[in-house]
């Protein structure tokens, strides 16, 4: 793939986000993205930062593997250092999830709780967006989310816009390299972040 093509494609996505915000009847003042330490959320958050609009990135660990959490914190730090329009907030969600599962202990179901983690994150993203006159920007790609349907309904699928919805995983990796995403993130095998 030619470098110019990758750059042009990234700019098309950046312009698309800006055009969406400019043409929406509700004029969003911020873009809110949950970051996991994976390539999809890293690319989307970097595209958002490149719009020049206020970009709020949230790390929301719930029983998360330390290496994934470390990658998300590293990416957030990189974004803040590179883009003056980026804010990062670490929202520890273990207590919220523990309270949720304690209240519902007689309805214990591992898969249900895994999906509930994604739904708690979605509710958090929308609360932050509401408090900042923003929109929630999704991180789903063409193959996993919009092809196979590998997402949590009303969880990570609950977003306002999905800039990489038409990108294959290979294209997401290409954009990540072009945008300067850390090799540690690019080389990490994808996970769903649910377990």
Placement of each model-derived feature along the sequence:
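ATP-dependent adenylation/nucleotidyltransferase module used to activate substrates
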Residues: 1-150
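Catalytic subdomain that performs nucleotidyl-dependent activation
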Residues: 135-195
